[in-house]
């Protein structure tokens, strides 16, 4: 039995009462929160280890509700100035094909280093390069070592609507030197591979790794494939996820919105999490709410690619579970939940011309308890409550940018940079303390970053991508 106690911190619990407890303690035993209290009212039990949190804020770990991890090695140049399908076919797919398993291992470690340093403890990795041999094994090995909580949502594509081919051909003409790649699979093959993946990895790493099926988008997956994913999630008591209405092409191809299309086939349910939802109207929001569908909003990515802004306030007003996802590392160019929270608040204030449209408290909820709800994991993570997993972060607000501070939620959302995250626990294990990562010691970090840079350059060269074009002011 291992015990750990965090003492004399300010707890932002995110429990149902949203209690904020000053000068408080949290007691952790075997990876779970077993007790908490205020020092003036109770005495913490003895512990094997005590972390002094004086001057710090203790929060549930941030939850990255939708992301693509490997793509972090494709950032830094080739993605800029491209909209979604241009980016997909001229950068993402060729770049993924040019990656080797050793590159994937480096990408996952780099991603986790940046994520943990910004307070992210859970990631929903939509793995769209899992089709390539060795990539899954490379990723899982690093995830197990690093200690993050991971949903490995294995994506699949089992059809492509022929009407989009002319559009793709035109986009390819912009980068003719880049090879056109296909990640299509036969439906039966995708089913077998995802089933085997779940059998091997779901529940491993002390329960930190989960496996979901992830049909990519409605125009690229058969109804058979989506029905199978829905049944798989139900039978194995997991969730399933897909990208929805990230562009307006989905509606053009279906002659109705993707939400309407899925409802026609009975595919909207409480185990489904949909990402993006940019091209949504009130009917689409109503359909998702009616079926208790969960949502992940990638606000920075949608802006980066010029896609638009999802109607998040309308979803929040209905009480829907909406989490925040940083999306691909190369269509956000950072893995910083605090930065994405700030952008979420600002873009909706601007679009709605309403300075109170999403409160800082709600934004913080979206990064914690609502993110957990969007993953169907709110019974285990997302708040500081007895019985839940000890995924906790300590923020030190004694920085110039967070001084002065009075309103904690507003300070975290609008003033913080991310470097205020001092200590991170996942399952009660300390994976970062004093900003030192357990899985990337300081003496190894520079050499590792140089290796990541070298591998990224080699990937772009193999894919014939131009990463540093001529200076362009217009």
From Swiss-Prot:
Residues involved in Fe cation binding: 66, 68, 276, 327
Keyword Iron part of the UniProt annotation: yes
Catalysed reactions listed for this entry: melamine + H2O = ammeline + NH4(+); ammeline + H2O + H(+) = ammelide + NH4(+)
InterPro entries: Amidohydro-rel, Metal-dep_hydrolase_composite, Metal_Hydrolase, MTA/SAH_deaminase
Keyword tags: Cytoplasm, Hydrolase, Iron, Metal-binding
Activity-regulation annotation: Melamine catalysis is highly inhibited in the presence of aminoatrazine.
Signal sequence range: none
Cell compartments where the protein resides: Cytoplasm
Site (Major determinant of melamine specificity): 84, 328, 331
Cofactor(s) listed: Fe(2+)
Enzyme Commission number: 3.5.4.45
GO MF, one example: ammeline aminohydrolase activity
Cofactor: record remark: Binds 1 Fe(2+) ion per subunit.
Pfam family, one: Amidohydro_1
Effect of substituting residue 84 to F: 3.4-fold decrease in catalytic efficiency with melamine. 11.4-fold increase in specificity towards atrazine. High atrazine dechlorinase activity and loss of melamine deaminase activity
Listed GO CC annotations: cytoplasm
Family: Belongs to the metallo-dependent hydrolases superfamily. ATZ/TRZ family.
Note: TriA and atrazine chlorohydrolase (AtzA) from Pseudomonas sp. strain ADP are 98% identical but catalyze distinct biochemical reactions. Enzymes differ by only 9 amino acids. These 9 amino acid differences between TriA and AtzA represent a short evolutionary pathway connecting enzymes catalyzing physiologically relevant deamination and dehalogenation reactions, respectively. Potential evolutionary trajectories between AtzA and TriA have been constructed, and catalytic activities of the intermediates along those trajectories have been characterized.
Functional description taken from the UniProt entry: Displaces two of the three amino groups from melamine, producing ammeline and ammelide as sequential products. Can also catalyze deamination of other s-triazines such as CAAT (2-chloro-4,6-diamino-s-triazine) and aminoatrazine. Has no activity with ammelide, atrazine, halo-triazine substrates or with pyrimidines.
Protein name: Melamine deaminase
Source organism (scientific name): Paracidovorax citrulli
């Amino acid at each position: 039995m291992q015990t750990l106690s965090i003492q004399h911190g300010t707890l932002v619990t995110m429990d149902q009462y949203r209690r904020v407890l000053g000068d408080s303690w949290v007691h952790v035993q075997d990876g779970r929160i077993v007790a908490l209290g205020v020092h003036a009212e109770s005495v913490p039990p003895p512990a094997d280890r005590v972390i002094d949190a004086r001057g710090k804020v203790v929060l549930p770990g941030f939850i990255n509700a939708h992301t693509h991890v490997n793509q972090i090695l494709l950032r830094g140049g080739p993605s800029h100035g491209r909209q979604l399908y241009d980016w997909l076919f001229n950068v993402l797919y060729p770049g993924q094909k040019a990656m080797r398993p050793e590159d994937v291992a480096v990408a996952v470690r780099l991603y986790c280093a940046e994520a943990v340093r910004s307070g992210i403890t859970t990631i929903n990795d939509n793995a769209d390069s899992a089709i390539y041999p060795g990539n899954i094994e490379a990723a899982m090995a690093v995830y197990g070592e690093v200690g993050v909580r991971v949903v490995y949502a294995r994506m699949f594509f089992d059809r492509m609507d022929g009407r989009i081919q002319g559009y793709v051909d035109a986009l390819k003409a912009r980068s003719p030197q880049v090879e056109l790649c296909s990640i299509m699979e036969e439906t039966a093959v995708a089913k077998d591979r995802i089933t085997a993946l779940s059998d091997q990895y779901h529940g491993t790493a002390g329960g930190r790794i989960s496996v979901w099926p992830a049909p990519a988008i409605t125009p690229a997956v058969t109804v058979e494939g989506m029905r199978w994913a829905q049944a798989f999630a139900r039978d194995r008591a997991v969730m399933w996820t897909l990208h929805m209405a990230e562009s307006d092409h989905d509606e053009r191809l279906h002659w109705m919105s993707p939400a309407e299309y899925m409802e026609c086939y009975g595919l909207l349910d409480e185990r489904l999490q949909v990402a993006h939802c940019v091209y949504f109207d009130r009917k689409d929001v109503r359909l998702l709410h009616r079926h208790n569908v969960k949502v992940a909003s990638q606000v920075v990515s949608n802006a980066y690619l010029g896609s638009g802004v999802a109607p998040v306030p309308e979803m929040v007003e209905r009480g829907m579970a909406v989490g925040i996802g940083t999306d691909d590392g190369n269509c956000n160019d950072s893995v910083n939940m605090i930065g994405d929270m700030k952008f979420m608040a600002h873009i909706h204030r601007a679009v709605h011309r309403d300075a109170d449209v999403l409160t800082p408290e709600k934004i913080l909820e979206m990064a914690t308890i609502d993110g957990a709800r969007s993953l169907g994991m709110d019974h285990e993570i997302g708040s500081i409550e007895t019985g839940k997993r000890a995924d906790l972060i300590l923020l030190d607000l004694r920085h110039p940018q967070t001084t002065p501070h009075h309103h904690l939620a507003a300070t975290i959302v609008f003033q913080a940079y991310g470097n205020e995250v001092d200590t991170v626990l996942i399952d009660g294990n300390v994976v970062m303390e004093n900003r030192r990562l357990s899985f990337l010691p300081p003496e190894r970090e520079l050499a590792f970053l140089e290796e990541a840079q070298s591998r990224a350059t080699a990937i772009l060269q193999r894919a014939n991508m131009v990463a540093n074009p001529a200076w362009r002011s217009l």
